[in-house]
UniProtKB/Swiss-Prot annotation:
Keywords assigned: ATP-binding, Kinase, Lipid A biosynthesis, Lipid biosynthesis, Lipid metabolism, Nucleotide-binding, Transferase
Gene: lpxK
Name listed for the protein in its UniProt record: Tetraacyldisaccharide 4'-kinase
Reaction catalysed by this enzyme: a lipid A disaccharide + ATP = a lipid IVA + ADP + H(+)
EC number, as in UniProt: 2.7.1.130
Family: Belongs to the LpxK family.
């Protein structure tokens, strides 16, 4: 709710009006049935937003994976933004961030047992996933597909950044909205993301009123929780110290940090690290940035200028996917590179309610699942 954070380019309003008219007509064609949305025979959950930029879609998708994977055969379908491939690609052990995109690759490496694919055409992608015989897909999670209306999801989850609520924003290019605020009405769940842990009750009430949701829509608030630093190159790290696998943030006291990010909003990570050390240099690139040879050289030079006896390079999990296969990253740097994991926490003691909302939808719309089979066996 930091309104100073929101930058509106008013001189671009005329272009935004034209863009808005085109998007509105497109949405109306779907609403009126002139353009058809396709439903599928399995639960399809869409996670998306109204704006461009980071609202935390990947961490929230990972939350759903962890919630569902033990009882259902889950598949994740993403567009694979900025990948160096086209069409439908099923993730394999040989996949890289270049072949499927950095965020899909991140999820694939963290959850290798979960089926993951990328396809610009989400209908085609779902059809391909459902044609897989083993395992037979029971739930599809659509990553960043809120505007892809050719698919009709059974449950739509809309994310909005606490610091840039969609009700405070305006359409591209003057603002960052992909479509008008009315698009929120397609969501059954709205989550205000990136909330401070100590958010006040009055802020909950203010945001609830400002979002102006319908009775059929459930509102939740979430926050980021940062885990222990993970070595990006564990084998390189073990050559120096075989006992070091991960580092708690509390161990960063008296450590010099070079923070390297290529994400939409690195400020929250920087603020988190400042809680443990004030010796931080930051090197920021655009979101989904593919690191060039010059970038790697710049990282090496900036890291070399850190004066402390103990020093590390800290990056995000997403950026780590683009560094891990980089051909010119030197062996001497690898042991010092750590990724900072992010997990989602549902606030207001609403986590159980949120989990049951998701599980209830999947259970009611799943034709066959290990969970349902065990439940039926227990009842008999």
């Amino acid at each position: 709710m930091d309104e100073h954070f929101i930058k509106i380019h008013k001189w671009l309003y005329p272009v935004s009006w034209i863009y808005g008219a085109v998007v509105t007509v497109r949405n109306k064609l779907f609403d009126w049935g002139f353009l058809r949305s396709k439903s599928f025979g399995v639960p399809v959950i869409c996670i998306g937003n109204l704006s461009v930029g980071g609202t935390g879609k990947t961490p929230h998708t990972e939350y759903l994976i962890k919630l569902l994977r033990d009882n259902y055969h889950v598949a994740v379908l993403s567009r694979g933004y900025k990948r160096h491939s086209r069409g439908y690609v099923l993730a394999t052990p040989q996949s890289t961030a270049r072949s499927i995109g950095d965020e899909p690759y991140q999820m694939h490496t963290k959850f290798p047992s979960v089926t993951l694919a990328v396809d610009e055409n989400r209908c085609h992608g779902i059809e391909q996933l459902l044609s897989i015989k083993e395992p037979s897909i029971e739930v599809v999670l659509l990553d960043d597909a809120f505007q892809h209306r050719y698919v009709k999801p059974g449950l739509s989850i809309l994310l909005t950044d606490y610091h840039r609520l969609f009700c405070d924003d305006t359409l591209l290019p003057a603002g960052r909205l992909r479509e008008s605020v009315n698009g929120k009405n397609r969501a059954q769940i709205v989550i205000v993301t990136k909330c401070p842990q100590d958010i006040k009750p009055i802020d909950y009430n203010i945001i609830t009123k400002r979002l102006n949701l319908y009775p059929y829509q459930q509102l939740y608030f979430s926050s980021f929780r940062y885990g222990n630093l993970q070595p990006v190159f564990p084998s390189a790290n073990s050559e120096i110290d075989s006992t070091v696998n991960e580092l708690p943030l509390s161990a960063l006291t008296n450590t010099d940090i070079l923070l390297v990010t290529g994400i939409a909003s690195p400020a929250p990570i920087l603020e988190e690290l400042k809680m443990y050390t004030d010796q931080i240099d930051s090197l920021s690139f655009d979101d989904h940035h593919h690191f060039s040879h010059r970038d790697i050289q710049q990282i090496k030079e900036r890291f070399g200028k850190l004066k402390g006896e103990h020093k590390l390079i800290v990056t995000t999990e997403k950026d780590a996917t683009r560094l891990i296969h980089h051909p010119v990253l030197s062996e001497e740097l690898k042991p010092f590179i750590y990724a900072l994991p992010i997990e989602i926490e549902i606030l207001q003691n609403q986590q159980d309610k949120f989990n049951q909302h998701i599980i209830g939808y999947v259970r009611e719309n799943t034709r066959n699942s290990s969970f349902s089979e065990r439940e039926n066996a227990h009842q008999s």
